[in-house]
């Protein structure tokens, strides 16, 4: 069964959850498909979500570390985008920082519906310890990863591609492979490529088979009338 491209402009806010336990209460971890966005508090996560959905769906703040909740946005009845709390901001109290990191790890390891993870990093300061931890958690769980090098407009094209190649080389040891792409919310750099990757993650084989079966059943019911 073929399906047209997912329209990310249809994303709408669904719920916020303070932690993985509450998220599992609201949305069981084995229902539908989720794509998670994770990154340091100043990586431009909210701006990226706003560009990709072409709306101000995620709240941006001049104060890094302000997003403390897991925010879920619905694309359709089967698919969701998840904005995870930013990590690594120095001014956040240590206890809260550790709670966030524990929650992020638990989310990546225990959400069976997770179809892919976008790890956003400032292209000028990529692959910090927590970035690597997020990537390793996802790879260990056999979840596809896109390392998105944000604020790519801050570098010239030559320096930009040099950094992209360096990051690809540093991540090449992961057997399942980690995609690496430059991105700029300001200039729209990489938007098309990212949407293509997200679109493919939204269409796992099991879901496409389910949708095909549902369509056949619906047609059979219609034919009875």
From Swiss-Prot:
Gene Ontology molecular function terms on file: GTP binding; metal ion binding
Keywords of the record: Cell cycle, Cell division, GTP-binding, Magnesium, Metal-binding, Nucleotide-binding, Septation
Listed SUPFAM superfamilies: P-loop containing nucleoside triphosphate hydrolases (SSF52540)
InterPro entries per the UniProt record, alphabetical: G_ENGB_dom (IPR030393), GTP-bd (IPR006073), GTP-bd_ribosome_bio_YsxC (IPR019987), P-loop_NTPase (IPR027417)
Gene Ontology biological process terms, A to Z: division septum assembly
Transmembrane regions listed in the UniProt entry: none
GO annotation, cellular component aspect: cytosol
Binding residues annotated for GTP, in chain numbering: 39-46, 65-69, 83-86, 150-153, 183-185
Domain EngB-type G as annotated: residue spans: 31-204
PROSITE patterns named among the record's database cross-references: G_ENGB (PS51706)
Pfam families registered for this protein in UniProt: MMR_HSR1
Binding site for Mg(2+): 46, 67
Main function: Necessary for normal cell division and for the maintenance of normal septation.
PANTHER family: ENGB-TYPE G DOMAIN-CONTAINING PROTEIN, MSS1/TRME-RELATED GTP-BINDING PROTEIN
Entry similarity comment: Belongs to the TRAFAC class TrmE-Era-EngA-EngB-Septin-like GTPase superfamily. EngB GTPase family.
Entry-linked NCBIfam families: GTPase_YsxC
Name listed for the protein in its UniProt record: Probable GTP-binding protein EngB
Gene, per the UniProt record: engB
